[in-house]
A protein has these predicted regions:
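Terminal transmembrane helical anchor/hairpin motif
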Residues: 36-42, 46, 158-232, 237-239
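Hydrophobic alpha-helical transmembrane segments
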Residues: 1-70, 110-111, 209-239
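Helix-capping/transition residues at the boundaries of transmembrane alpha-helices
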Residues: 11, 69, 80-82, 145, ...
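Membrane-interfacial segments
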Residues: 69-72, 76, 112, 116-120, ...
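Alpha-helical transmembrane segments of integral membrane proteins, especially early/N-terminal helices
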Residues: 11-27, 90-99, 178-182
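Short amphipathic alpha-helical coupling elements at transmembrane boundaries
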Residues: 3, 7-11, 78-82, 193
Length: 239
């Protein structure tokens, strides 16, 4: 798994995707940070992360689009299926490589609450909790993108498909409110407003609550989509 992780991580910076992904997130964060905190005087950095939710929807598909679709296009996916390393370890190695790339801008984001603190009142506990929640939300989107990438050999289809799915997830609270009552008056839809991907994030950024149940929900989704990815790749072994 370590060799897969190193190879995959290196590929993101050899192809410039890693640099573009990091630069885009850091630049957009800087714009929102300047607007909300430096010029607007808001003491909570979490406001910036709330505004960054849509930005991450656009960035994640760029990161995940090649992770498995490129292997399928170049026919090197057969090497994955015959590798002495188990398939779950290969998938996990690739996932952790993307997580590492994503963690770099997150580490830079951690400087922002400290800058606020140096210039006045800051709420470090709430802000760092929000950064962690933002990282976990992005990790869910990465797992989803990885699964979509396993379904196609086209990077463009992978990116567009991932963006479409995470966009629906982002808009789901509004979509569900417009559904007919006979579709929404049940146990599942009563549960969903409390545990939606963006709803959990809002608990941290808007209400400053450390939502443990929401984090468990995130972790469950990550494992679920990693499992789907393993099954998707495994299916090709027998096809």
């Amino acid at each position: 798994m370590k060799a897969v992780y190193k190879r995959e991580l290196k590929s993101y910076f050899d192809s410039m995707i890693g640099y573009i992904f990091i630069a885009f997130l850091v630049a957009m964060n800087g714009i929102y940070f300047l607007y909300y905190n430096m010029l607007g005087g808001y003491p909570y950095y979490s406001y910036v992360l709330g505004a960054m939710e849509f930005i991450i929807l656009m960035a994640i598909p760029v990161l995940t689009m090649k992770c498995l679709s490129d292997e399928r296009r170049s026919k090197t996916d057969q090497l994955l299926l015959t590798s002495p390393v188990s398939l779950p370890k290969i998938i996990l190695g690739k996932y952790l490589a993307m997580e590492t790339v994503f963690a770099i801008p997150m580490a830079i984001f951690c400087l922002c609450p400290l800058i606020i603190k140096a210039n006045g009142t800051a709420y470090l506990r709430e802000d760092f909790a929000s950064i962690f929640a933002f990282f976990m939300m992005g990790s869910v989107f990465i797992a989803i993108g990885m699964f979509i990438s396993s379904l196609t050999e086209s990077q463009i289809i992978s990116a567009v498909g991932t963006f479409g799915i995470v966009l629906v997830i982002y808009l789901w609270p509004g979509i569900s409110s417009m559904l007919p009552s006979f579709l929404t008056d049940n146990f599942i839809t009563d549960l969903l407003p409390n545990y939606t991907v963006t709803g959990v994030m809002d608990s941290f950024t808007s209400y400053h609550l450390f939502d443990i149940g929401g984090l468990v929900f995130y972790i469950s989704l990550i494992f679920l989509f990693l499992f789907f990815t393993i099954q998707s790749v495994q299916k090709r072994r027998w096809s």
